[in-house]
Amino acid sequence: MSRNFYNYDPTVDILQPPLIPDVILKSNLKELTLPTGNQVLESLPLTAWFHRTRSNIISHLTRYEAEWETQKSAARNELHSVKSYLKGNIFNDARELYALPETNILTICAYFAGRIITNRKNWGVSAATLQSVKSSVHRPSLMARVCTSIPSKMVLPWAMAGAVFKELAPTAFDNTITSLESDILDPGFVAQYKTLWRDYYTNGAKKASIEAAELLEGKLQGYIGFARNFIIYSTR
């Protein structure tokens, strides 16, 4: 008996076109024959969509990469400008620049010390909530109330940090104030606060304290001189 019992010839089936209408085949599909004899159908709209999507992705990636490189270059230039400005206008003292790490560490420690001082829990203020109603309620002292007030919380940590930085790096501190006044703050605001500083501090509180110290020193010297003369005349 023949192997092709139903008169089936596989070569004829391979060479026959697929069972697809000619309209669809001519408009949306493309038929390709591989070297092995297999037939492949390519969807032209799907291929066009893949090409279009691939081109858009490549275009977006190229644009984002160029923008990223531009931003990196701009950030690098800004960082270089900031370093040059700080080195030329703020930290222009070689001794202070050499000791800058220690100065920064101590300044940060002073800031956190101010935060600790202005924390209510460190003064025992919150202990009253843990006590019963019948027991005596813990009342904070005047110093605790002053240190834990809202103005103290806002000013004291920065004031302590500024005092330490001014003590360890006076030139850099003065240069920082000068740079803030000339490059960042408004000239009208600078002139106004300088006038207030001169009227109320330089010619006011500071002058009064200097005069009081000189008066007290003169009085003490007079009393010491009187006591010394009294002792001298008494021992004769």
From Swiss-Prot:
Annotated membrane topology: Multi-pass membrane protein
Compartments, record wording: Mitochondrion inner membrane
Topology feature Mitochondrial intermembrane, residues: 1-96, 166-236
Gene Ontology annotations of biological process type: cristae formation; positive regulation of protein oligomerization; protein-containing complex organization
Parts of the chain on the Mitochondrial matrix side: 114-145
Any single Gene Ontology cellular-component annotation: MICOS complex
Keyword Membrane among UniProt keywords: yes
Broad class of where this protein is predominantly found: mitochondrion
Membrane-spanning intervals of the chain: 97-113, 146-165
Keyword annotations from UniProtKB, A to Z: Membrane, Mitochondrion, Mitochondrion inner membrane, Transmembrane, Transmembrane helix
Domain of life: Eukaryota
Subunit structure as annotated in this protein's UniProt entry: Component of the mitochondrial contact site and cristae organizing system (MICOS) complex.
Annotated function: Component of the MICOS complex, a large protein complex of the mitochondrial inner membrane that plays crucial roles in the maintenance of crista junctions, inner membrane architecture, and formation of contact sites to the outer membrane.
Similarity annotation: Belongs to the apolipoprotein O/MICOS complex subunit Mic27 family.
Protein name: MICOS complex subunit MIC27
Organism of provenance: Eremothecium gossypii (strain ATCC 10895 / CBS 109.51 / FGSC 9923 / NRRL Y-1056)
Gene: MIC27
